[in-house]
C-alpha cells in the first residue's frame, strides 16, 4: 500500500527536473497525479511513463506566466478527479538579469511565475482541502531564498518572497492544511543547465559538505515526506535540501 493511495496530487512544472521526479514518485506511492507544463509532448511522456508503471495521471497544458493558469489547472483537475489533496507549487523560471540592467518586465515575469502563480493556484485548491478537513501544500523556494546569489536579482527576490508566502499561508490555513516549503540548492536540472550548469554554480558546490549537485529524486523524497502524515507535526517550515551549504 502506497503512502499516497487514492490521493490527488497537482505538481506544477512537472514535465522535467524536480517536478517530473516528484510526479513519478508520487504515482509510485499511489497518487493520482496531475502533471502541468507548457509542452504537450513532454507532458504526455511523463503521463505515459506513469501509466506504464501502473500509476494514474493526467496532464494539463498551462503556462504559469498566464493569468488563466490557476483556473485552468484547477478546473481540469476537478473535472478529472473531483478533489485535490496535495499541491506542489514547483513551476518556476530563472532569469540571469542583473540589478543594473534588469527591466521591469523581466523582474515582474520572475515574480509572477515563481510566486504569484503559486498563490493563485493555492487559493483555488484551499477551499477544497478545507472542506475535506485535510490537505498539503508544498512550495518550492530555493537556497537563494535564504541568502543571495550574485547576478540573479529577480530570482533571488522571488524566492525570498516564496519563503514569506509559505509562512503566511501556513499561519492562515492551519490547522486544516499543512503548508511547507523546500529550498533546493544546486540541483541537476534543465533549468540549471540553461544558465550555465555546474560551472556557474561551482562556487556554491564548493561550499557544500557533499561537494556535488543534487538530483531531482532527492527533492522528490522530501516532497513525499511533506505530502503525507509522516510530516504531521511539521508546518510552516522551509526545508533546505542543498548538500550542506555553508555548514
Model-inferred region functions:
Residues 98-99, 103-111, 192, 200-204:
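Substrate-binding pocket helix/loop in short-chain dehydrogenase/reductase
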Residues 122, 158, 166:
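Active-site helix of classical SDR
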Residues 88, 174-178, 234-236:
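Short, small/polar-rich loop/turn modules that mediate ligand/substrate recognition or access, typified
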Residues 127, 170-175, 232:
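Alpha-helical segment proximal to the catalytic Tyr-Lys
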Residues 142:
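Residue(s) in the substrate-gating loop at a strand-loop-helix junction
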Residues 119, 134, 212-241, 246:
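C-terminal substrate-recognition "lid" of short-chain dehydrogenase/reductases
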Residues 8, 15-17, 39:
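Conserved glycine-rich cofactor-binding loop
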Amino acid at each position: 500500500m502506497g503512502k499516497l493511495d487514492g490521493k490527488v496530487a497537482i505538481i506544477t512544472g512537472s514535465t522535467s527536473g524536480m517536478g517530473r521526479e516528484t510526479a513519478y514518485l508520487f504515482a509510485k506511492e499511489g497518487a493520482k497525479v496531475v502533471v502541468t507544463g507548457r509542452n504537450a509532448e513532454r507532458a504526455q511522456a511523463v503521463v505515459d511513463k506513469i501509466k506504464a508503471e501502473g500509476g494514474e495521471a493526467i496532464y494539463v497544458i498551462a503556462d504559469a506566466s498566464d493569468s488563466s493558469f490557476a483556473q485552468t489547472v484547477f478546473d481540469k483537475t476537478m473535472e478529472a478527479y473531483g478533489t485535490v489533496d496535495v499541491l506542489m507549487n514547483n513551476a518556476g523560471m530563472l532569469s540571469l538579469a542583473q540589478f543594473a540592467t534588469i527591466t521591469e518586465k523581466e523582474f515582474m515575469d520572475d515574480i509572477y511565475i515563481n510566486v504569484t502563480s503559486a498563490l493563485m493556484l493555492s487559493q483555488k485548491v484551499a477551499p477544497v482541502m478545507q472542506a475535506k478537513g485535510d490537505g498539503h501544500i508544498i512550495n518550492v523556494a530555493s537556497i537563494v531564498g535564504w541568502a543571495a546569489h550574485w547576478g540573479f536579482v529577480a530570482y533571488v527576490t522571488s524566492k525570498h518572497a516564496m519563503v514569506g508566502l509559505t509562512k503566511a499561508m501556513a499561519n492562515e490555513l492551519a490547522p486544516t492544511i499543512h503548508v511547507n516549503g523546500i529550498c533546493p540548492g544546486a540541483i541537476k536540472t534543465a533549468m540549471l543547465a540553461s544558465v550555465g550548469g555546474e560551472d556557474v554554480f561551482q562556487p556554491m558546490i564548493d561550499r557544500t559538505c557533499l561537494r556535488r549537485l543534487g538530483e531531482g529524486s532527492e527533492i522528490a523524497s522530501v516532497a513525499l515526506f511533506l505530502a503525507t502524515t509522516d510530516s504531521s507535526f511539521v508546518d510552516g517550515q522551509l526545508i533546505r535540501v542543498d548538500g550542506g551549504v555553508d555548514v
